[in-house]
């Protein structure tokens, strides 16, 4: 019996394989002892006493969604093999000098096996900057994965790579088609738990985003899914204290790009005092002040993206706006919206003219020529990082590198002030 090639580089529980397949695989203990405690070998979670089964074994509840790991069973993996060497990059575009510098730095990072952080502003063109390093690894027979905590980021990157690379590309998320073996994989960070020493190069985008940030399980998945001599590259527009510390300690090399690809400055948010949003919302009405701003924006004809702090408020706002603006096509998306992918595409295609969203769309999506309003911008869910990312949706297009970015609030807080200050600093660093 031959090994199924789709199994190479993948990690399996005992029950996922036949007896014949298990005999062909390498074996790992499903759990290990660490300071007297049992720890899951797939997700690195400590096993609690209540996770005990009547059969006399423990199981891991943390990664249960990806099939049960039991202490009385093993984990199995099939060592990754090299791919045929191939020339895969179809993209013939031109990088800006700033992008070229980062691209060259990434090629050097591969040669020197130096883990690297790319800190680039929103709209800098991070995707194009990684093309050369991705192509280099694949051209040499290696395996590459681009991972992100957010499904929207994965979908956007996947579409871009399909256009610009000639090899097959596997897209993996909770609702995707089954995996097939290919030298280029796009996956949510949770999907990395299903790989073991599979990739020569792993690029993690949006490393400051939930659910990746401060998640030891996903940090472990990132470490475990890369070959022992493989390389990790991290991309972000809003760095974290932990990443900055690793740069200071020399554990990460930093490459910075403070300028957008079209050379125009980041849009500076404009804070707008709005104290009656909730009072009117509770009456199923729209604040007259907010309505006047929406009226003015709709006369421009540009699409409008409105961020709401909570799902319930977003749903209420959609109903109210639909009454107030009957000629507009309005949508709402959140983490629990079943047709959110379809609505996002409809907004991108111009079929929806106003889209209301929770922070689920704060990053990883591009809507040409869009204006952005944030209501209750001083809500605790809108962190400095979140507000910077939201602001990054505006002015991304060469056709319209400007746009309105309004933060409606009933009291300026630290997050708003720090977000504005950091955006101003990035423009200054870029010489703009």
Model regions: which residues?
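Interdomain "pre-motor" coupling segment immediately N-terminal to P-loop NTPase/helicase cores
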Residues: 30-82
């Amino acid at each position: 019996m031959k090994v199924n090639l789709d199994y190479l580089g993948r990690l399996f529980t005992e029950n996922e394989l036949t007896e014949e397949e298990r005999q062909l695989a390498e074996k790992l203990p499903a759990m290990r002892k660490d300071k007297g405690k049992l720890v899951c070998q797939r997700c690195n979670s400590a096993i609690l006493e209540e996770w005990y089964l009547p059969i006399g074994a423990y199981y891991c509840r943390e990664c249960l969604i990806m099939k049960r790991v039991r202490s009385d069973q093993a984990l199995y993996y099939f060592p990754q093999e090299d791919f045929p060497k191939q020339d895969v990059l179809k993209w013939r575009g031109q990088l800006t000098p700033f992008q070229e510098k980062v691209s060259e730095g990434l090629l050097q990072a591969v040669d020197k096996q130096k883990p690297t952080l790319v800190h680039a502003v929103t709209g800098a063109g991070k995707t194009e900057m990684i093309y050369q390093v991705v192509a280099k690894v694949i051209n040499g027979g290696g395996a590459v994965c681009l991972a992100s905590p957010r499904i929207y980021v994965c979908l956007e990157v996947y579409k871009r790579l399909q256009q610009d690379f000639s090899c097959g590309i596997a897209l993996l998320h909770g609702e995707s088609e089954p995996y097939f073996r290919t030298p280029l994989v796009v996956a949510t960070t949770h999907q990395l738990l299903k790989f073991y020493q599979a990739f020569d190069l792993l690029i993690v985008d949006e490393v400051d985003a939930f659910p990746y940030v401060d998640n030891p399980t996903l940090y472990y998945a990132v470490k475990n899914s890369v070959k022992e001599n493989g390389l990790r590259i991290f991309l972000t527009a809003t760095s974290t204290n932990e990443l900055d510390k690793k740069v200071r300690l020399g554990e990460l090399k930093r490459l910075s790009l403070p300028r957008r690809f079209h050379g125009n400055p980041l849009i500076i948010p404009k804070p707008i005092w709005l104290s009656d949003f909730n009072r009117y919302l509770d009456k199923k009405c729209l604040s007259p002040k907010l309505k006047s701003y929406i009226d003015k924006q709709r006369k421009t004809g540009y699409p409008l993206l409105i961020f709401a702090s909570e799902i319930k408020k977003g749903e209420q706002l959609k109903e109210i706006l639909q009454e107030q603006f009957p000629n507009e096509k309005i949508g709402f998306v959140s983490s629990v919206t079943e047709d959110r992918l379809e609505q996002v595409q409809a907004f991108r295609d111009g079929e929806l003219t106003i889209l209301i969203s929770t922070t689920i769309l704060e990053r990883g999506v591009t809507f040409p020529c869009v204006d952005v309003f944030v209501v209750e911008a001083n809500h605790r869910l809108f962190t400095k990082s979140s507000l910077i990312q939201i602001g990054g949706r505006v002015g991304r297009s060469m056709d319209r590198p400007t746009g309105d970015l309004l933060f409606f609030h009933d009291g300026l807080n630290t997050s708003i002030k720090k977000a504005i200050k950091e955006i101003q600093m990035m423009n200054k660093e870029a010489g703009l």
